[in-house]
Regions:
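Short, intrinsically disordered, charge-balanced linker/junction segments flanking boundaries
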Residues: 1, 100-102, 212-214
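C-terminal polymerase-core module
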Residues: 156-214
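Surface-exposed helix-capping loop/turn segments at secondary-structure junctions
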Residues: 30, 135-141, 174-178
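A generic secondary-structure signal for well-formed alpha-helical elements
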Residues: 23-31, 87-95, 170-174
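Conserved pre-motif C helix in the palm subdomain of viral-like polymerases
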Residues: 3-32, 108-135
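Well-ordered mid-protein domain cores that form the structural environment of catalytic cofactors
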Residues: 17, 21, 25, 41-50, ...
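Conserved polymerase palm-domain catalytic core
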Residues: 50-146, 150-165, 185-191
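Short, glycine/acidic-rich hinge or "gate" loops at secondary-structure transitions
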Residues: 32-41
Length: 214
């Protein structure tokens, strides 16, 4: 997978982004789903690894089926206006919001991969989706590693229905699209793939393409 990564000079841009994130981090963390991970201190791939492994081993009935979903072209597809309006519901300082929005506009459409502040904004933008997913019947466990979503539940039909509702929410509320390569399958017949690993009820293995990098 090829991505265009943008970098900013340490001074003053990098320092300003660091200061903005430091100021808004406590506010964003309060509303963040506990299994929303990636680019968050203490919540890397290992955090999701432990959650999925534990769920599969300890709750066979509640994890009969898995769903793997991705957001299509996530960073470039994020609406700057929708994002800043969502942020304005949590942060009331207009000068702060104007500064953040100026950085968003400098990305040239969507958010820039490589900007420190954009990692936090991208995670925040899906906060409402995380909350919505956990209200859906049939979704017992959910983890999200930035734009990669893994669901576990007891019923295949309910997961299919949840998948359709999630796609509709993405489009109508966030202006995003779900990748067409989504998958729903029984965990007894196929290992769950997430954060570079493949999980079964009894063991976990490193995905082949990740192993070959070493």
């Amino acid at each position: 997978k090829h991505r265009k990564i943008k970098m900013v000079p340490f001074w003053p841009d990098g320092v300003i982004q660091w200061m903005l994130v430091t100021a808004m981090k406590p506010v964003l963390m309060r509303g963040m789903h506990p299994w929303s991970c990636a680019s968050i201190p203490g919540r890397g791939g290992k955090h999701i690894y432990k959650k999925i492994r534990s769920a599969l081993r300890n709750d066979p009935k509640g994890t009969k089926y898995a769903a793997e979903l991705d957001v299509a072209q996530y960073y470039p597809s994020i609406s700057g206006k929708r994002l800043i309006w969502a942020l304005a519901r949590k942060i009331k300082d207009k000068r702060f919001l104007r500064t953040v929005y100026s950085i968003i506009e400098s990305c040239g459409g969507g958010l820039a991969i490589g900007y420190y502040i954009c990692q936090w904004l991208a995670n925040f933008y899906l906060e409402s989706l995380d909350q919505y997913i956990m209200t859906l019947p049939g979704v017992k466990y959910m983890t999200r590693y930035m734009d990669n979503i893994t669901l576990l539940g007891p019923n295949k039909k309910q997961l299919h229905k949840a998948r359709k509702l999630i796609a509709a929410f993405m489009q109508q509320r966030l202006g995003l699209s779900m990748k067409a390569n989504w998958q729903i399958y029984p965990t007894a017949k196929r290992m769950v793939s997430a954060v570079g690993y493949r999980f079964s009820r009894t063991h976990v293995i490193l995905r082949k393409r990740n192993f070959l990098r070493f």
